[in-house]
């Protein structure tokens, strides 16, 4: 059983991980297999996600693969999976920065045009401060997204994971802050399906949750830095 496989309902080929040896939590013993979407024993249930993307739940029952469908060395797939996840997080971080930048621009434009008491609401200093706070969070996320991109090719897996987790923490926190501020500063229109702000926020929320949210990666960062062991 595989859950929330992104684009899993439209893919022609699926890369499936499966344990071929060892215990449930062992690093060794995982293998990757290339499975045809039409293979006997494979069923897919596709659905739309909250951000308008597509995913699927897969059930594999008695699926057979040929020796040539094994990807890489059997039993040694964990480091490969780990690296692909890190590279994916780096890519998602860049996407999140783009979404946050669009949300910030959209919000600033709205503050300049929406009027209350006969003046643009952007003339109120407290709202200007909130727009600046959004920009600060955006730039923090941008810096960490660049860092994640730089470190995605790092040969040392520990150093790479530390950098990726640090980036994911900041991306998640910034995404939530920028998204919430954008919705609140827009008022009711920010929550409508017809307006772009809510869609950006949904996508940012899904990016935060993908491959571990900010809290998960903060714990990972503490483990990689030895902070949890030291505290224990």
For each feature predicted by the language model, list its residue ranges.
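Helix-biased detector of long, well-ordered alpha-helical tracts
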Residues: 59, 64, 78-85, 91
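Residue-level signal for inorganic ion chemistry
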Residues: 33, 58-60, 100, 141
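Cytochrome P450 core scaffold surrounding the K-helix E-X-X-R motif
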Residues: 69-74, 114
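Residue-level signature of the cytosolic catalytic core of signaling kinases
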Residues: 7, 73-74, 123, 193
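Alpha-helical interface subdomain recognition
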Residues: 82-232
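Flexible, small-/acidic-enriched active-site or ligand-binding loops
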Residues: 4-5, 35-65, 73
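A short core secondary-structure module
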Residues: 1-44
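A generic structural signal for well-ordered coil/turn residues at beta-strand boundaries
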Residues: 9-12, 26-29, 38, 54-59, ...
């Amino acid at each position: 059983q595989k859950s929330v496989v992104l684009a899993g309902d439209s893919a022609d080929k699926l890369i499936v991980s499966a344990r071929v040896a060892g215990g449930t939590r062992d690093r060794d013993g995982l293998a990757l297999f290339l499975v045809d979407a039409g293979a006997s024993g494979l069923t897919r249930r596709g659905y739309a996600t909250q951000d308008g993307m597509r995913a699927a739940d897969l059930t594999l029952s008695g699926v057979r693969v040929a020796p040539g469908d094994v990807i890489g060395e059997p039993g040694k797939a964990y480091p490969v999976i780990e690296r692909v996840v890190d590279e994916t997080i780096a890519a998602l971080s860049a996407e999140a920065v783009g979404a946050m930048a669009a949300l910030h621009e959209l919000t600033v434009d709205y503050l300049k045009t929406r009027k209350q008491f006969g003046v643009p609401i952007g003339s109120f200093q407290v709202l200007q401060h909130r727009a600046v706070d959004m920009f600060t969070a955006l730039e923090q996320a941008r810096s960490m997204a660049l860092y994640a991109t730089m470190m995605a090719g790092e040969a040392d897996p520990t150093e790479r994971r530390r950098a990726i987790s640090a980036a994911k923490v900041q991306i998640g926190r910034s995404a939530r802050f920028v998204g919430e501020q954008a919705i609140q500063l827009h008022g009711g229109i920010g929550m409508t399906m017809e307006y772009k702000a809510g869609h950006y926020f949904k996508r940012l929320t899904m990016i935060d949750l993908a491959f571990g949210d900010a809290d998960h990666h903060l714990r990972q960062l503490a483990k990689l830095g030895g902070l949890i062991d030291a505290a224990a």
